[in-house]
């Protein structure tokens, strides 16, 4: 059995880990970094860049550089209109009311784009392990609904991965934190503020059992929102001074987005930072520059409502777990955004204790996912993970009410059924409107599926008995069935299409992803070949100068002729001509060096002979004849 890797698919950054013996190891990417920006760029020539290479060119290519795509995962287009206004790339309405990113007329789903990041993680792991990777545990925010979980699973499939388990991020963090503390019974709170989402989970740890008692969160609260407060402040200040809204120009927007993120990070360790963006825009009167000082106090004032917003789910999760702050033994901060001093201060103030510093907030989730992979493969023993469903599940009943079958924070996997009946006399069909959420009315909750149970025999209202059953697996993915108890006729659906993609679309995207991987390989090989030519041209020019008169004029002419051909091929970037040029230069060098060494050997052979003749000369006495 191959290795099951653990992937933290983040809004801002992603991370991959794998079990090596009894230790989870975070794997550095090709750029040598332990986390990879969740950024995808489409550049000229059809090449797709992922991670740091994509991030580096974002300012000059803002409309074709996609970041924070996780915020669109599993949502309908109508749910993401506000998000779409905040990004420099174009988000349009696609099939099944799904949001799609428009890149030169080609519409990409959030799943396809996330799959590109997952492919990068997969390749990173394969390069490290020296073997093909096909299985993964992927993390999601605890408060992700069914559609968002399905979308994540689909992204994994498109990337060529069999998703062995979808695991909640705070649970993964707790697993990483508590693996070496199996003998200690304790209750922990995991406060997870990432780039785009926020979760709070309360867990009980003991004897290798990790039991989630409750979870809560906000899937629209993260580091991006803190950045946005700085973006809006900068843009509003500049507009007041210059009368220009920088948010309307994609390139200017990208520049202030990057500056805002940098300022936020700097303010975690400094009391003040300067934002300096020369030539941020231009008017008829000339270029305009943006120079502003931002203090930590001002930033905390700008983001105050966001910090307070994060504490509401914390209080609710604690209440749902039936605990008070005094019952919590450890507080763990997860996610890069928890490095903001105000966050740590607020959390520590709420719980009345210092947060644990024993975990790396950027890596702990991926490590936990790798440990879960180890549990599934049998490499990690004596660990049991008991997670919960984050949102209540039910169906719409008379009057547009949501009738709950499975309450939020129920341990999964689980199954629950309830008997319902018809609302009208001789009703032949029952439509089941499956919902997920926490509101009383159906209209206020998330629709995750609809299906009909047909063929109900004519009967007065309230007589037929329809058993509705909900089944949630360990991934938090739902199956719903309805059975007419009188006839035994039943119908069930696995809520597969709640993300808006059909199985055919997923298969097509999977093939596209494989084709892209092939195209990326060709593009990489092309660059490598051009670089090889560039290197050989430089080496040849250097060696011709160094060797000088040691090479005959005839051989020097042959090398220079081949070198000229290679230079022309390098300029044209014709790979076939480059390969021919490389072969010709190498062949000319081979002939020249063979002749050079042969000449050297002849010289060495003549030298011993002369030395031998000298050794045979002896001194003799002679008499001068007069």
Swiss-Prot record:
Keywords: ATP-binding, Chaperone, Nucleotide-binding, Phosphoprotein, Stress response. Residues 598-626 are annotated as: Disordered. GO terms for molecular function: ATP binding; ATP-dependent protein folding chaperone; unfolded protein binding. Disulfide bonds: none annotated. The modification Phosphothreonine is found at residue 197. Induction: By stress conditions e.g. heat shock. CDD domains: ASKHA_NBD_HSP70_DnaK-like. InterPro entries: ATPase_NBD (IPR043129), Chaperone_DnaK (IPR012725), Heat_shock_70_CS (IPR018181), HSP70_C_sf (IPR029048), HSP70_peptide-bd_sf (IPR029047), Hsp_70_fam (IPR013126). Residues 598-612 have a biased composition (Low complexity). Residues 613-626 have a biased composition (Acidic residues). Pfam families: HSP70 (PF00012). Acts as a chaperone. Belongs to the heat shock protein 70 family. This is Chaperone protein DnaK. It comes from Flavobacterium psychrophilum (strain ATCC 49511 / DSM 21280 / CIP 103535 / JIP02/86). The gene is dnaK.
